[in-house]
Every structure is written in structure tokens, then in C-alpha cells.
Swiss-Prot record:
The organism of origin for this protein: Drosophila melanogaster
Keyword Hydrolase: no
Major place of residence: membrane
TM region(s), chain numbering: 101-121, 128-148, 181-201, 215-235, 318-338, 349-369, 415-435
GO molecular function: ionotropic taste receptor activity; ligand-gated monoatomic ion channel activity; taste receptor activity
Disruption phenotype: Impairs avoiding N,N-Diethyl-meta-toluamide (DEET). Leads to high male courtship toward males and mated females. Also leads to diminished aggression level of males.
Cytoplasmic side: 1-100, 149-180, 236-317, 370-414
Name of protein: Gustatory and pheromone receptor 32a
Length: 461
């Protein structure tokens, strides 16, 4: 046995009649409509849908599969997915090959006068900013394609671990973890609308006839931005899936805390029902179930931490690139707004709409990513805090708690961008602080450029 492993001794007077027993829920009487925290044993086993966890995100999965960013996996069973077939693997390989070919073509176009008509500005600084922004978009999406192709096996392993974990929850408690991913469709529609609107604005801003090369560059530019944003939404959805499962075990553990057990003794549950509080998730559990549930919670927590870190490992390079690209895009568009508002010439409605569309897209994505990472990290680190409040009325329970707190549960976890910085609820504030600093630098360059135009050097005679 590894020196880092530990064993919790179960009470000898209790025996299991079934390897995966289902107890009547201690939270509330049996009902037909159960939520994620009910442990009622259903009268008849219900048949699950294919991929019960990922059924709610099938739309975004279909988009990523069609674009080659996700493997077209095969369904082995309700709780297991298998590797893609040779045909599906060849399709993904072909799509990625087309993407890399277009990337090389677009990078070549950026370094030649072919793409000059796509840049509209009044100053040289503006042209440089737009050129760098377009190059960062291409590099971000190319890196996303490379990383997704490299992490195909890891992503399938993460999906299988989530499915197996849900299977264990269903066998142990008869519970289906409820989840609502309606925001995914809204984000997909918003991303598509923003990209289409931005491309239309760009076409109308070009003076003269647009060349076929510019059309290709614009179309691929929109597709790259859209798919990169879609992958960020997918990563946020995975984190929300993990958050729901962390929340489940924390609510299960919260029923054993001193406060909840004290309420049970004083008849707090009856008083809450009289006040109309029907929330079943805070009702205390019977302490006699704590040794059994503690083993399940510890095992599930370790699996969730492994999934959490696996998602971070699969996405960290993509996140670094995307955050850098978003930072630069937000900064340049804020700068363009400043130039339009403070300029002496006529304000261009086209540029204003362009800037607002970009800001809405990137700020919403940054907010979604920061919130998803922050919620999941907070819930993962809350387990040890809840465990410290468990009502340990006997030495047996206290030993279990001590063993929990001396292991990895007490170590805080972070979702990082390749280890450079943590992504949480404060990330958006940090990004806007950096945007403000860089915006001041750009404004100083603009003022320097304006001063050179207003004060020309006199010719020497």
C-alpha cells in the first residue's frame, strides 16, 4: 500500500446487504420528482438518455466536433464513451489540415500588401494595432486546434470520469444531478450574431471593390473568432459540471455539521416547515450514516479534483492565448473609442459599432470564464471548511474528520492559465486594470504622433 493512502475503519456492528445500498432519503420523504440532493430509491429503474451528463451541451459539442476541436467519439454505454472510429478520426484530421492551410495563407496575406484594404484608420499607430490584433486571432485559433488535437485522449478520459462518477452517485443515492445549461445556446447565438455583424461592418468599411483574398481573410477571421469563443464557452460548461458535483458532496456533508445536527435535536426541521421553508438541501442527516457517506465523499472529492486538474491541463495553453488576445482586443477597441470621441473630425458610426460589438463579445466571455472558474474553485476549497464543522460526537467520527483534514482536502486548488496567474472572480478586474495601463500608453503614443504632425520640422536653407 502506498504510504500516502489511508483507511477509515467502518463500524463492525453494521453490515451491507448490497454492495451499493440505496437508503431512503434523510432529507425529506420520498417523492416522484427528485432533485440532485435526493437519495430516494425509485420504484422502477428509469432508463437513462445517451450521455446523461453531456445531453444538455450536445449543441456545443456538435459544433466542436464538426470543426475538429473535439473528437467524434463513440458511445459504448450510457456511462462510457469510446475513441472515434477511423472514419471520424480521418474527418477531424482533414478539417484540422484545412485550418492549418488557411492559417498559412492568411499569415502570408498579412505580410503582403494584399490585406492593406482591410485596415481603415487615420494614424499609423491604429494600423499597427489592428494588424497585431488580427495576427493574435489567427495564432490563438491555431494554438487551440493544435492543443485540442494533442489532448484528444485526455478529453475523452475526463468525459468518462465524469460519466463514471455520475453512475456511482446514481447507484449509491439514486440521484440524478440536475443541471441547467440554457446559457450555452444563448452564448452560441450571441457569438454567431456578433461575428456576422462584425464582418458586415468590416465589408462596408472597405473602400473600393473587395478582392477575393480579402473575402477569404474576413470569412476565416470570423470563423476563427467564433470557434475560439465557442471553445471557451465549452470549457466554462465543463467547469460548471464539476461545480455541480462539488456542490452535491458539500451539501451532503453540510447535513452532518454541528449546526444542522443541533437543529435536529431542537426540532428545527418542524419549525422551518411551519415557516414555509421547504428547502430540502439543508435538512440534517442521521449521524449513523456519516462513516459510510464520508468514504463516498472523500472518494468523490478526489475524483473531482482529478477531473478539475485534468480540465486545467487540457485548457491552460488555450486560456493563456485567449486571455492575451482578449486583453489586446479590449484595449485596442477602447483606444479606438477614445480616438473617435476625442478626435476633431466626424465620428464614424461604423467604427463605433465595430468597437462596441467586440467589447460586448469579449467582456461577456471573460465574465463567463471568470465566474465559472471562481465558482468551481470556491466550491472545491469549501469541502474542508464544511468538514471542520462536522458534529463529531464520538471519537470514531473525530478520527475520520482528522484523517480527512490531514490529507489533500485541506490543500487549496486553483484554476490557472498555465501557472502564470489564477483565474477566478477577480480575473476580470485584473484584466481591466491592465487594459487601463496599456490604454494610457497608447494614448501617449497618439499624442506624440499628433505633436509631430502639428509641429513639422522647418526646412533648412
Amino acid at each position: 500500500m502506498s504510504p500516502n493512502t489511508w483507511v477509515i475503519e467502518m463500524p463492525t456492528q453494521k453490515t451491507r446487504s448490497h454492495p451499493y445500498p440505496r437508503r431512503i432519503s434523510p432529507y425529506r420523504p420520498p417523492v416522484l420528482n427528485r432533485d440532485a440532493f435526493s437519495r430516494d430509491a425509485p420504484p422502477m429503474p428509469a432508463r437513462n438518455h445517451d450521455h446523461p451528463v453531456f445531453e444538455d451541451i450536445r449543441t456545443i459539442l456538435s459544433v466542436l466536433k464538426a470543426s475538429g476541436l473535439m473528437p467524434i467519439y463513440e458511445q459504448v454505454s450510457d456511462y462510457e464513451v469510446g475513441p472515434p472510429t477511423k472514419t471520424n478520426e480521418f474527418y477531424s484530421f482533414f478539417v484540422r489540415g484545412v485550418v492549418h492551410a488557411l492559417t498559412i495563407f492568411n499569415v502570408y496575406s498579412l505580410f503582403t500588401p494584399i490585406s492593406a484594404q482591410l485596415f481603415f484608420s487615420y494614424r499609423e499607430t491604429d494600423n499597427v494595432n489592428q494588424w497585431i490584433e488580427l495576427l493574435l486571432c489567427i495564432l490563438t485559433y491555431t494554438l487551440t486546434v493544435f492543443v485540442c488535437a494533442h489532448n484528444t485522449t485526455s478529453m475523452l478520459r475526463i468525459m468518462n470520469e465524469i460519466l463514471q462518477l455520475d453512475e456511482e452517485v446514481r447507484r449509491q443515492f439514486g440521484a440524478n444531478l440536475s443541471q441547467n445549461f440554457g446559457f450555452l445556446v444563448k452564448f452560441l447565438v450571441g457569438i454567431t450574431a456578433c461575428q456576422a455583424y462584425i464582418i458586415v461592418l468590416k465589408i462596408y468599411a472597405v473602400q473600393g471593390e473587395i478582392t477575393p483574398t480579402s473575402y477569404i481573410l474576413l470569412a476565416f477571421y470570423g470563423i476563427q473568432n467564433g470557434l475560439t469563443a465557442t471553445y471557451i464557452v465549452f470549457a466554462s460548461a465543463l467547469l460548471r459540471i464539476v461545480y455541480i458535483r462539488f456542490h452535491f458532496i458539500n451539501q451532503l456533508l453540510n447535513g452532518y455539521t454541528y449546526g444542522q445536527q443541533h437543529r435536529r435535536k431542537e426540532g428545527g426541521a418542524r419549525a422551518r416547515r411551519q415557516r414555509g421553508d421547504v428547502n430540502p438541501n439543508v435538512n440534517p442527516a442521521l449521524m449513523e450514516h456519516f462513516p459510510e457517506d464520508s468514504l463516498f465523499i472523500y472518494r468523490m472529492h478526489n475524483k473531482l479534483l482529478r477531473i478539475y486538474k485534468g480540465i486545467n491541463d487540457c485548457c491552460n495553453l488555450i486560456l493563456v492565448s485567449f486571455l492575451g488576445y482578449s486583453f489586446y482586443t479590449v484595449t485596442t477597441n477602447c483606444y479606438n473609442l477614445f480616438v473617435q470621441i476625442t478626435g476633431k473630425g466626424m465620428v464614424s458610426p461604423n467604427i463605433l459599432q465595430w468597437c462596441f460589438a467586440w467589447l460586448c463579445l469579449h467582456v461577456s466571455l471573460l465574465a463567463l470564464l471568470s465566474r465559472s472558474c471562481g465558482l468551481t474553485t470556491t466550491e472545491a476549497n469549501a469541502t474542508s471548511q464544511i468538514l471542520a464543522r462536522v458534529y463529531a460526537k464520538s471519537k470514531e467520527y473525530q478520527n475520520i474528520i482528522d484523517k480527512f483534514l490531514t490529507k489533500s482536502i485541506k490543500q487549496e486548488v486553483q484554476f490557472t492559465a498555465y501557472g502564470f496567474f489564477a483565474i477566478d472572480n477577480s480575473t476580470l478586474f485584473k484584466i481591466f486594470s491592465a487594459v487601463t495601463t496599456y490604454l494610457v500608453i497608447l494614448i501617449q503614443f497618439k499624442q506624440l504622433e499628433d505633436s509631430k504632425v502639428e509641429d513639422p520640422v522647418p526646412e533648412q536653407t
